[in-house]
Amino acid sequence: MVAEKPKTLTSLEGDDKLNSNFVRDEDERPKVAYNEFSNDIPVISLAGIDGEKRGEICRKIVEACEDWGIFQVVDHGVGDDLIADMTRLAREFFALPAEEKLRFDMSGGKKGGFIVSSHLQGEVVQDWREIVTYFSYPTNSRDYTRWPDKPEGWIKVTEEYSNKLMTLACTLLGVLSEAMGLELEALTKACVDMDQKIVVNYYPKCPQPDLTLGLKRHTDPGTITLLLQDQVGGLQATRDGGKTWITVQPVPGAFVVNLGDHGHFLSNGRFKNADHQAVVNSECSRLSIATFQNPSPDATVYPLAIREGENSIMEEPITFADLYRRKMAKDLEIARHKRLAKEEMPFKELDEAKFESKSIDQILA
C-alpha cells in the first residue's frame, strides 16, 4: 500500500523512518556524503570584469563551462546585506505553521507558491524538500497573490534580489557571448523577453538520508541558473554520466552558476549543461535559492555559433516551449516505466495513467 503523500515535511518531523514516498531506487541513491567537499568547481572573482581583468575572467569562465558547466562567482555586486536578508526571511517562512505555508499551495497548476517536492505530476518518488516559487520576470507578469506575505518584508526583499540577479545574469551571458565570438548581448537577445523564476529550496533534516535525494539528478532547461546556498553542503555534480559525483564546496556569499540546456544548445554543445542533484542529511536543515534565467516560451532554440568543421547538434530550430515539453515528456515516461516496474502495473493502466496537457506557464511553474 502506497503511503499518503505529505502536504508539508514539517508533518514528518520526529519520524525515525523515511516515508516510503521518498525512498529512491538503489541506483539513484547518494554515492558521496553531503559534506565530503571537493574543490574541483572553480571559484571566480568578477572584480574588474569591466576593466583590464575582463579577458582573464572570461577565460576562466569559458574553461569552467567547457569542463563542468558549473562555476562559482564572488565579487559579483550583490550586497551581503541583501543576501543575508533573503536567506533569513526564507528560513522564517519555512518555520511557519503548516497552515500558513499551505495558504500559498501551488498544487493543481497554480503559478507560483508553496509545495512539497515538485510541481511535476507523475513522479514516482518525491524529493525531500519544500519549495517556494516566484515568477519574477517579466515584471508585468508578477502575480503578487502567489507571493507569500509572511514573513513581513519578504516581498520587497525578493523584488530587490530579483533585480540584482537579473543584472548579474546579463553580465555573465555577455561573457559567454563574447567567448562565442558574438556581440555582447547575443545570448540575452536569444532569450527574447527573458523569464526569471526564483525557487527557494528548504531541505529539512532527514531520518534516512542515504535512501533519498533532496532533488533528483537533472539538468536545468533554461539558459543559466544562479544558486545561493548556505554553508551546510548538498549540491552535487557529475561530468561522467553519473559514475562519479562531487559535492560542491560552499563559499560564503558566492553564487553557483549552472549552465542549462538552452545555453548548451546555443553554444552548439561547446558549453556543458550542468548535470547535478541535491542530497540531504540527518544533522541539520539546508537552504538554497535558485534563480533560473530562461528564454521566453516562443524564443527559438538553435546554435548561435557553429565552429569550422562542426555540424549543428540540433536537427532543426524549435521553440523553448517545445524543448521543455519534450524534456518533461521524456522525464515522465521514465517515471512511468519505473512505476510499472515497482508496482507491476498492467500496461492498460499505464496507458491510461493521468497526463494532463498544460500551458507553458504551468509547465515552467
Swiss-Prot record:
EC number: 1.14.11.9
Top EC class of this enzyme: oxidoreductase
Superkingdom: Eukaryota
Limits of the Fe2OG dioxygenase domain: 191-295
GO molecular function, one term: flavanone 3-dioxygenase activity
Manner of cofactor binding, per the entry note: Binds 1 Fe(2+) ion per subunit.
Gene Ontology biological process terms from the UniProt entry: flavonoid biosynthetic process
Catalytic activity as recorded in UniProt: a (2S)-flavan-4-one + 2-oxoglutarate + O2 = a (2R,3R)-dihydroflavonol + succinate + CO2
Keywords: Dioxygenase, Flavonoid biosynthesis, Iron, Metal-binding, Oxidoreductase, Vitamin C
Pathway listed: Secondary metabolite biosynthesis; flavonoid biosynthesis
Entry cofactors: Fe(2+); L-ascorbate
Positions with a binding annotation for Fe cation: H218, D220, H276
Pfam annotation, one family: DIOX_N
InterPro entries according to UniProt: DIOX_N (IPR026992), IPNS-like_FE2OG_OXY (IPR044861), IPNS-like_sf (IPR027443), Oxoglu/Fe-dep_dioxygenase_dom (IPR005123), Plant_2OG-oxidoreductases (IPR050295)
Annotated 2-oxoglutarate binding sites: R286
Family per record: Belongs to the iron/ascorbate-dependent oxidoreductase family.
Function: Catalyzes the 3-beta-hydroxylation of 2S-flavanones to 2R,3R-dihydroflavonols which are intermediates in the biosynthesis of flavonols, anthocyanidins, catechins and proanthocyanidins in plants.
Name listed for the protein in its UniProt record: Naringenin,2-oxoglutarate 3-dioxygenase
Organism: Dianthus caryophyllus
Lineage of source species: Eukaryota, Viridiplantae, Streptophyta, Embryophyta, Tracheophyta
